[in-house]
Amino acid sequence: MSANTFGTTFRFMTFGESHGPYIGVVMDGVKPGLSIDVQELQHELNRRKPGQSSVTTPRNEPDEAQIVSGFYDGKTTGTPLCILIKNQDQRSKDYGPIADILRPGHASHTYIQKYGVFDFRGGGRASGRETALRVAAGAIAKQFLRERGVQIIGFTRSVADVVADTSTDAVSVDVIESNIVRAPDPVAAEKMIEVIHAASKDGDSVGGVVEVVVKGCPAGLGEPIYHKLDADFAHALMTLGAIKGVEIGNGFAATRLRGSVNNDPYYKAENGDFRTVKNDAGGIVGGIANGEDIVLRIAVKPASSITKPTKTANRAGEMVDFFVEGRHDPCICPRVVPVAEAMVALVLLDHVTLQDRIASSSQAEQVEAKIAAVDKEIELLQMQRKLYEGERARLASAEKISEV
C-alpha cells in the first residue's frame, strides 16, 4: 500500500492495523540533540485514547508509547525516531458476522475495489486507531514548535446543532479540558453531552465541527502556489477518515459576504508590525502566514459504526440488515481535537524546517558570494602583481643596457 508517508522535510510514516499486535510511526528528518518530554508525549496520547468518558468508545487501550529508536538519554540522535503502541483490547470476534457486508460509511467497499482484499477487523488500516500515531508524532512536533513560541489550541466548536460561544477573544485551554466534549463554552458543553447521550441511546451517532487555532506563527511562513500553508493544512486534515470539509478564516461564510466586507484592511501596530483589523483570512494570505492567529475548522461526520440497523448489500449483492456490535464512539469530536492539533503541528514543523533550510541556503549563498568577491579581488591583485613584476623586469633590463 502506497501513500503512507506525510511531510517534505519533516516526514513521518505510520503502520499497523486496528486489530494487529502493534501500530507504529517512524519520523525522519528529526534534528539531533533535541529534548523530548516523554510524559508530555503520553499526555497527548491520553487525550485521544478510548475509554476516557461516557461519550467515547469503551475500548480499553492504555496507548503507552514505546520509543524504540532515534532517542537516547532524553534527546534525539538524528536517526529515524520510531514509536510503537501495543494493541491490547481487540475483540475481532465482534466483526466476524459482518466480514462480507459492505459497511455503510466505511472503507470496506473502496479498499476491496482498489486492493481486492480488506481487513474487516475494526476497519484494519482505515481504522481511526491509526490516528494515535499521528498524535504521537504531533506531540513531538508541538514540543519543538513551542520552543519557537508557537501554541496550538483545538476545541469542539459544535455538536449536531449545538454551537459553542466563541465570541470572546480568549479561548481557555483549562475550560476546554475541563469537560468531556472539549468545548470552550461550559453551557454548550452540557447540551452537547445531552445530544450525544440521546444519539447513543438510540443506537446512533452525531457529528460536529472542530476548530484549531494557532498562536505565534511567524509572518512569512509558507510557500506560494503548490505548497501553500493553507493548502497543506487542508490536505493534512482531510487525510483524517471522518473529516468531510475544511475551512480557514471566514471559510464558507465568505461566500455570503461582499468583498468590501470580507476584505481585511491592515494597520500598523504600536510595535511596528502590520496587523489586520478582523483576521477574516484566518491568518493566511496567498498561502503564507501574515502573523495573525491561524483559524481552521473541520467538519466531522457522525461516526459510521452504529448499533441502529441499516439495510445494505453484502459482497454477493444481497440486501441485509447491518448493525455493529463492537464498541464505538457516539461522537468522535472530543477525540478528534488532539488529532487535528497534531496534524496542524506536523504541517507547521514541516514548513518551519523547510524555511530553515531556505534560510541556511540563503546564508550559504551569501557566504559563497562573499568568497567569490574575495576571489575576484585576489585575482585582480595577482594580475597587478604580474604587471608590477613585468615592469620591474623591464626597468632592470633597461638599466643593464644603459650600463653597457
Where does each model-flagged region fall?
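Glycine-rich, mobile lid/loop segments that gate access to catalytic sites or pores
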Residues: 113-225
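Glycine-rich anion/phosphate-binding loop at the beta-strand->alpha-helix junction
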Residues: 18-21, 135, 203-319
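Glycine-rich, N-terminal phosphate-binding loop and its surrounding beta-alpha-beta segment
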Residues: 44-104, 108
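Alpha-helical support elements that line or immediately flank enzyme active sites
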Residues: 21-33, 128-150, 227, 231-235, ...
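The feature captures the hydrophobic core positions of alpha-helical coiled-coils
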Residues: 367, 371-374, 378-381, 385-388, ...
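N-terminal, positively charged regions that mediate nucleic acid binding
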Residues: 1-59
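Short acidic, glycine/tyrosine-flanked loop/strand segments centered on an H-E-D-like triad
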Residues: 99-125, 310-330
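Internal helix-turn-beta structural module
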Residues: 305-368
